[in-house]
């Protein structure tokens, strides 16, 4: 009998009941909630006269709708948009009513759900983790079974601590070799999506492995797993190792004392067996990956910074040709235009993909001693949590950004999505460290280019895309 993959082990350890229709009942260890997908779920509980089943499994924070400017210090009443204000207030009210742990808008621990979960040690190896947000795959970086759920499923988990799900197939994405200087986790995952496409992972749980993945920090692994969903996979994960254990140790929600020792011993098994069989295997050579830039309206429309935008006339597949033509029109680009000729209007460094302290350090290394180009209308840096903001300020990163001409903001989802005051104007091009470049994602008519934090900072000071390796020393 073949060995088990990491996903197989996590699935089996959370399986409550296998059902005749092929679906299964899965137990949920950690439930993270925010203000957008939870109000309807709580209302459903009330109508059914139920209460949350396991209060201690839930943590909450507002992130999607919160302002990132100083006005938020005035509290929820300072949120201008009526719907946003109501959603944040409703989250507070629901958490207060049921005694749920919430890091409220002006709590120093507040931040983006997929940043604060790991930061607090609420995400642990071997756990099943869900949130009403598609980028919950981020937490898979800890050897956890993590994925997004819909609002009705949020209610189911609140009420029963279980979820109806179907087991996925196994995909291994192996990235071997050493990353070149200046190439990051963000470049790896964009290259993976460019290779397999946004539907490549449909129906799969992806395990990212190989020497290049093992060499990444935990924050880098979170970036990779975060964008599993952009590759079509609801679940992305990395096996647990010494780096995972060291990252979790001592965090507020992490086990303590004898429980810690038992946990660490159990976590040693959170790897795929040597003889495990994967349904699909994808291989990349890390040495061949260059800094990536998305050019179109899908994350799979991505190229190395030294390449040219594609020419639809050279695409024999009629469907793909049509997609390229539509993307070029929306993005205001010309066939064969060099990536480095794309003029930018705004730069956004933040989101659940790239707003952690290592991301901010990488961007600050590029910005230090330089100025944002005069052609850039706005460049903003939004830390992923209040604790990250405080750490960055302790290191003086805020001063580096401010002196260079960036705006230094409060934590939140910000310009990743047009659900708060931070958004693009129609026709504006933005170098963004976020995860999605769909039409209108950052604002109606906005044009998004996905890049790493270092590449975003380089674009800010250059006014156009440039290979960041031309600006920094090895």
Curated annotation (Swiss-Prot):
Return the HAMAP family for the record.
LeuC_type1
Presence of keyword DNA-binding: no
Q: How is the cofactor bound?
A: Binds 1 [4Fe-4S] cluster per subunit.
Q: Pfam families from the entry? A: Aconitase (PF00330)
The protein's organism comes out as Pseudomonas syringae pv. syringae (strain B728a)
> Which domain of life does the UniProt lineage start with?
Bacteria
What NCBIfam families does the record point to?
Answer: leuC (TIGR00170), PRK05478.1 (NF004016), PRK12466.1 (NF009116)
Q: How does it assemble?
A: Heterodimer of LeuC and LeuD.
Which sites bind [4Fe-4S] cluster? 352, 413, 416
What enzyme class is recorded for this protein?
lyase
Q: In which pathway does it act?
A: Amino-acid biosynthesis; L-leucine biosynthesis; L-leucine from 3-methyl-2-oxobutanoate: step 2/4
* Cited CDD domains: IPMI
| Family recorded in the similarity comment | Belongs to the aconitase/IPM isomerase family. LeuC type 1 subfamily.
User: Could you identify this protein by its name?
Assistant: 3-isopropylmalate dehydratase large subunit
């Amino acid at each position: 009998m073949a060995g088990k993959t990491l996903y197989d082990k996590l699935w089996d350890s959370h399986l409550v009941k296998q059902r005749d229709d092929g679906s299964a009942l899965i137990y949920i260890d950690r439930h993270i909630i925010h203000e957008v997908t939870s109000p309807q779920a709580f209302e459903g509980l009330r109508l059914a006269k139920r209460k949350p089943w396991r209060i201690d499994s839930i943590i909450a924070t507002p992130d999607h709708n919160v302002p990132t400017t100083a006005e938020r210090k005035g509290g929820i009443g300072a949120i201008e948009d009526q719907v946003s204000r109501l959603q944040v207030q409703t989250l507070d009210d629901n958490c207060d009513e049921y005694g749920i742990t919430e890091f409220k808008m002006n709590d120093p621990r507040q931040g983006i759900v997929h940043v604060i979960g790991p930061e607090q040690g609420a995400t642990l190896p071997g756990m099943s983790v869900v949130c009403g947000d598609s980028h919950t795959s981020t937490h898979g970086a800890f050897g956890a079974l993590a994925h997004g759920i819909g609002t009705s499923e949020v209610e189911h988990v609140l009420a029963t601590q279980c979820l109806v799900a179907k087991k996925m197939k196994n995909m291994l994405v192996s990235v071997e070799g050493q990353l070149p200087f200046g190439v990051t986790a963000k470049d790896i995952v964009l290259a993976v999506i460019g290779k397999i496409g946004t539907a490549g992972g449909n129906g799969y749980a992806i395990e990212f492995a190989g020497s290049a993945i093992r060499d990444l920090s935990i924050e880098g692994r979170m970036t990779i797993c975060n964008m599993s969903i952009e590759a079509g996979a609801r679940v992305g994960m990395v096996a647990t190792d010494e780096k995972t254990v060291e990252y979790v140790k001592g965090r507020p929600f992490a086990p303590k004392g004898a429980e810690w020792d038992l946990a660490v011993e159990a976590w040693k098994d959170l790897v795929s067996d040597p003889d495990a069989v994967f349904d699909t295997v994808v291989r990349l050579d890390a040495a061949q990956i260059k800094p990536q830039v998305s050019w179109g309206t899908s994350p799979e429309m991505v190229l190395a910074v030294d390449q040219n935008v594609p020419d639809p006339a050279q695409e024999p597949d009629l469907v793909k040709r049509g997609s390229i033509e539509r993307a070029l029109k929306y993005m205001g680009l010309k066939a064969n235009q060099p990536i480095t000729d794309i003029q930018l209007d705004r730069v956004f460094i933040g989101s659940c993909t790239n707003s952690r302290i290592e991301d901010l350090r990488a961007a600050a290394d590029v910005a230090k001693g330089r100025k944002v180009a005069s052609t850039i209308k706005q460049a903003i840096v939004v830390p992923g949590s209040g604790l990250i903001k405080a750490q960055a300020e302790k290191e003086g990163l805020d001063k580096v950004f401010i002196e260079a001409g960036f705006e230094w903001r409060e934590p939140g989802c910000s310009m990743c999505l047009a659900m708060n005051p931070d958004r693009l104007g129609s026709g504006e091009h933005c170098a963004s460290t976020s995860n999605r470049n769909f039409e209108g994602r950052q604002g109606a008519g906005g044009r998004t280019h996905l890049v790493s934090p270092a590449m975003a900072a380089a674009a800010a000071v250059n006014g156009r895309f440039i290979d960041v390796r031309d600006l920094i020393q090895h």
